Amino acid sequence: MSSVVRPPDPCLVAIILITCSRAGPRFVYHYPPNPSIASAPSRSNSRTKPSPRASDSSPSSDNEEGSSSDEDDLSQTPRIGSPRPTNVRRLSSGSPSTKAASQQRKSNLGGSELDDTETPRDGRRSERSHELENPPWDSFLGLGTDVWEKLLCPSSSWHKRRFEVGVNDLTFVGWPVFVREDGTWRKKRKKKKTRAGDSVLDTAPTLGSEKGGYADGGEKLESERDPNVDGRSDKDEEPSRSLIESHPDEDGSVTDGTKDAMTMFNVVFVMNPPILEHNLRIKENYDNVIKKFGKGLKSEQATANYVWKEAQKILHIKEKGRENKSSLSSVYEELLSQSSLAQAIATIYRSISTSKIASITLTPHTTMSLQIPPLTSTPYLPGPMEPAYPGLWLTTADSLSATDEVTEMEYSGPSKVLAKHFALLLLSDEASILKDIEASMGTLGPPLAHYIRSSKPTKSFAQISARSSIPLNDIQVLAAHLIYWRRARAVPPLNKQDTYIVSPNCDLSKLGLATAAYELAFPTMPSLPKMLAVLSGTPRPYASFIPSRDHKGIYYDILAWLMRGGWVTQLRTFGWIKVDQELKSAVEEALASEEAKEREEELASSTATVIRVNEPQTDDGASTSSSSLDSEHSNATPVQERFAHFQGHQKGHDPAQISSLILRPHRASPLEARWLDEIISRFPDDHLADRANESEDFEGEVSIHRYWNAFTKYFNGTDALEKIPVREGLSRKLVWRLLSRIDISSNPADGEVHRNEKVLVTVRHW
């Protein structure tokens, strides 16, 4: 069982292919043949006027005509949890023509409202002749295709930009691509010699099947490394192999010199999202499917004039069906069997609308994989009015924390950072995954199988790399590959000293099925209800449930099984540094003393200057001058007293009278930095050196001063303290001994604890 939840309903109604040549726009193809919006969710605030909209594009991204970044980063995925909200500003680019609007009002997406001057008999007669002249594939949602082709063919200013049109409750979203002014589809680039150091992961072809085609996702992340490594930039890269792999481009671009050559194509996705989820559903479909599919077609069009040839083939089949008066089903059967582009669009619709991975083949040398990333975890429980996903992994472990360093690699999923300290948890049986890999017969298969056999959920990527001699970068690529294909999940390494509890988000409705599956996997172990009952008690380390050393392996397998199904989650500890009033007062007094000292030094410096200026005077004069200055200084309010008066005024406010928490110690303000310095200066540390030699299991000199700087960056409330041993390379025993000494809520058994050490406030949650 797996806790990976498929994405919500993508709200996909249909997919349309629009092309434009010098002869005008053409509605080439749509799938499914008879789209329906009857089952779509109702919306109270319908849009009545079509209005094209597009998102703002930065000069370096979608809206850059001469840049090749859009056609070269076919594998890049936007930043799952993300977490990656972007503000989209929609700009109106006008409204459809009066004729189109009139036809829309008459038809009303299939309505039969008659014109004022038309009699019912004339209406029926014209309707019958219309059916004879126009076959069913020449209409879409009750309107003629000539209406849609005008509406969905934007101007060249929308080149490689998000094109969005609203018609009633439907939203039409596309990524139009226009031919360049020189008649080509992309800039010519100099060929680069293949580097001698390329590994098998850099050259492995796609495998092209949803079940066994693991190479797509793996190379997807291989190509998402920093493009500027080794001096290469985005503009120097060939189209990424993650989503598309094509034969070499001999001349950089292919053009058709005929009079009716194509100048634009636009694959439009028709969606009907709920009002409250409109922006989210549109964005995730555009970022993960629409834009990437458009980039793939753009590359193939530049290479082999692919889109234009397929469009001509589709139009020819439809024209032949018109002449032969073929049925709609027979025409679509022929289209799907003879046109790879029509088949690809149909596959995308069927897969994306059911929240699956769409694996498509454009040419024998070109394959793509598209998907809307699934939900793998949630950091919070849903509210009364929020959608619930029972069984989803409840954790904050894969959320970006304050100290996380953004790596060079991204992947398609809610986790934005695939850190080297994570481990890989397979979501299905290892044997079945290895069987699928062997059946795929890809060049990525052997290293992928080797990594799966070497991987354990108790070992991090860095540890597996050290043990198996697999480069860490390759391990991250292979792990991200399995995650992309929904066969694994990145988790903190399982450890018996960690605490695990029954997840509040577990799906108890599946307890019966899960119990049967659990008994098949662990027939001699305690039953699933018993394990859940034990873990529901007072939280304690998982090691306390393991009866003996011989049972450690099987109990780790049980824990992995429970984590995989979302039945348990790790209870983690988070902390902040507390600054009490006494420490604040001490720092304020120190600051006041320093300021008074600085003023005295400035005053002494100005006095010395006056004396030097009056040097020619007699000794009496100098004495008089000095006495005058001293008298003036004595008559003024003393600096220290004035500052104390100011501080007394400040103390009347609440912030100076209450304790504070330092939320970001690694980015502390100047005042917070002084608080931290004062805290560490108060730590008593002399008695620890003597105790280090009294016990053999006391691991060296446990000095808070020594580890304070390494620990403080984790005291931000977002980084679990369980990360410290893994990331700092320290033993868990040493780390928790130190943390228990400074934790306000704990009393370690080391002996007397000094009051000044208690500065850490901790909480526990997932």
UniProtKB/Swiss-Prot annotation:
Residues 62-74 have a biased composition (Acidic residues). It holds the Pfam family HTH_NPRL3. It comes from the Eukaryota. Residues 1-23 form the signal peptide. GO terms for cellular component: GATOR1 complex. Residues 33-140, 186-257, 594-638 are annotated as: Disordered. Residues 51-61 have a biased composition (Low complexity). Residues 36-49, 89-110 have a biased composition (Polar residues). Residues 118-133, 217-250 have a biased composition (Basic and acidic residues). The keyword Heme does not apply. One of its GO terms (biological process) is meiotic cell cycle. InterPro entries: HTH_NPRL3, Npr3. Keywords: Meiosis, Signal. PANTHER family: CGTHBA PROTEIN -14 GENE PROTEIN, GATOR COMPLEX PROTEIN NPRL3. Belongs to the NPR3 family. Mediates inactivation of the TORC1 complex in response to amino acid starvation. Required for meiotic nuclear division. This is Nitrogen permease regulator 3. It comes from Coccidioides immitis (strain RS) (Valley fever fungus).
